[in-house]
């Protein structure tokens, strides 16, 4: 009997620890202000959805600017591991002819809240675009030497006629090496 009572108390205690909302003195449920703030802040960030054609045009530009295009998703651990390296490079190369673009292609449902919140949190609002991956076809993947859309992160580098591609997460050293080799 003691085990049953003890088990019930433990379950009740654990269940009460999960506080999503609380009731005020009048018995009206209220929501945690940080939850409201995060949703409000995410709503303020308006990310741009672009077409496959626009993305291909951006990937194909051949001029003196270095274009670094990273395909990612907010739920992807390896993608998130390399974001600090990209942020550091963006800051370091500010004012130089380098354009960083992050393409969120997966989980369209996250485009309303998770991706904008991520963009705001990482100060990447001006670097993230949204592309519906379901519209990618063989023609789209023909723009890459190796990538067929089978994994992320994937980073495409282009300056003039030179291109580099990296499938998988990059270390800071590898990112620096790729960028420096194309900026020469």
Each model region followed by its residue ranges:
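N-terminal targeting signals for export/organelle localization
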Residues: 1-49, 184
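A short beta-strand-turn-helix
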Residues: 46-66
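Short pre-active-site segment immediately N-terminal to redox-active cysteine/selenocysteine motifs
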Residues: 65-67, 72-75, 107, 151
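Hydrophobic beta-strand anchors of alpha/beta hydrolase catalytic cores
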Residues: 68-69, 100, 155
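Conserved redox-active cysteine motifs that mediate thiol-disulfide chemistry
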Residues: 71-87
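Structural microenvironment flanking redox-active thiols in thiol-disulfide oxidoreductases
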Residues: 83-122, 136-141
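Thiol/disulfide oxidoreductase modules built on the thioredoxin-like
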Residues: 133-180
């Amino acid at each position: 009997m003691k085990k049953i009572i003890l088990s019930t108390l433990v379950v009740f205690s654990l269940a009460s620890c999960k506080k999503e909302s609380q009731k005020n003195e009048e018995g009206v449920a209220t929501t945690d202000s940080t939850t409201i703030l995060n949703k409000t802040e995410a709503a303020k960030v308006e990310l741009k959805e672009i077409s496959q054609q626009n993305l291909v045009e951006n990937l194909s530009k051949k001029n003196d600017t270095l274009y670094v295009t990273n395909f990612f998703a907010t739920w992807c651990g390896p993608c998130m591991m390399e974001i600090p390296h990209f942020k550091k490079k963006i800051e370091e190369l500010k004012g130089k002819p380098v354009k960083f673009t992050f393409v969120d292609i997966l989980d369209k449902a996250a485009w309303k809240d998770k991706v904008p919140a991520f963009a705001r949190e990482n100060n990447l609002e001006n670097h993230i675009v949204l592309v519906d991956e379901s519209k990618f076809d063989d023609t789209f993947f023909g723009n890459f030497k190796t990538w067929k859309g089978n994994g992320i992160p994937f980073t495409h580098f282009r300056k003039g006629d030179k291109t580099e591609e990296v499938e998988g997460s990059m270390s800071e050293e590898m990112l620096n090496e790729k960028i420096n080799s194309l900026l020469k």
